[in-house]
Amino acid sequence: AGTLDGPIKRDKGSYLISARYFFPEAVLAIADNAVRYGFYDVTGKLTYDIHRNHTLSLGIYSGDDHMKNKEDHAENGFGWGNTTASLRLESRWNDNLRSSVVAYYTYLQNRQETEFKDDGFSNWGKTTFKTHEFGARMTFDQRLSHIWMLEYGAAFSHQRFEPMHTKSIINGQHKNRGYSSEQLVSGALFLNNRFQWGGWRADVGVRGAVYDNSEQTKYAVEPRAQLSYDFGRDNAVWLSGTINSQALVQFNRYYYSMPIDFW
């Protein structure tokens, strides 16, 4: 693992790069071990003050895990990973109003790869499941008095699911098959009132959401409330309640009894 960070320009911007690698994988490869497992991930962040009240930041993360089992004539591999990138603008409009705007992209995938060779007979196949998502969120924090603060904003996302796409080569013949992709569009508006006095804090809010998958549209209203008291020294008690909704897209692989969920 290693981290590199520093300033881009004095008192204006900075950068950070961090990476990790599972080094026993290299040892297993040198020893020609039949079973190998490894992972890596890379994190990067750039931050720059484009104005004394406006800060722009770019964040990127990519990670992957993989496992392989190799025998005399056969090799099986599995892998899963994700990549995400976000661009965020933090703004301070006055002493009582701040805002945050973020746009993001996320890619999730898992895969299975098999290869068999024996006496001129050769089979190879790879099956993948993928999810692409891009979206945006805008949030405002506004102080109305010394005990009352409002948080409000909007969110949007678009997801595309690509279930079970298989590529194979069987004795020189190429074959491709898979299910059609599915899409989900969702949006939300939210408002939260926060009251704070002494050790007491109360939150009362509501969120309205809509989900559309090209076949049907669903609406949801999600009220939420919380009351808490802070005794100090990391001791607090709270009571909360919320009604929450979530879109779930589920694909079942026909040769497994277990489902593969994306949410």
What are these regions (language model features)?
Residues A1-F23, D32-H66, G77-Y105, L144-L150:
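Transmembrane beta-barrel wall of Gram-negative outer-membrane proteins
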Residues G2, Y40-G44, I60, G81-L87, ...:
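Hydrophobic, lipid-facing positions within transmembrane beta-strands of outer-membrane proteins
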Residues G6-I8, Y48, S91, H132, ...:
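Residue-level signature of outer-membrane beta-barrel architecture
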Residues R10-F23, T55, G63-H66, S99-N123, H165-I169, Y229, ...:
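Surface-exposed extracellular loop regions of Gram-negative outer-membrane beta-barrel proteins
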Residues V27-A34, K68-N76, T84-R88, D118-T127, ...:
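Extracellular loop and loop/strand-boundary signature of outer-membrane beta-barrel proteins
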Residues E71-G79, Y107-D118, S122-T131, R160-I169, ...:
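Extracellular/periplasm-exposed beta-strand and loop segments of Gram-negative cell-envelope proteins
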Residues M149-A236, Q246-V249:
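Signature of Gram-negative outer-membrane beta-barrel scaffolds
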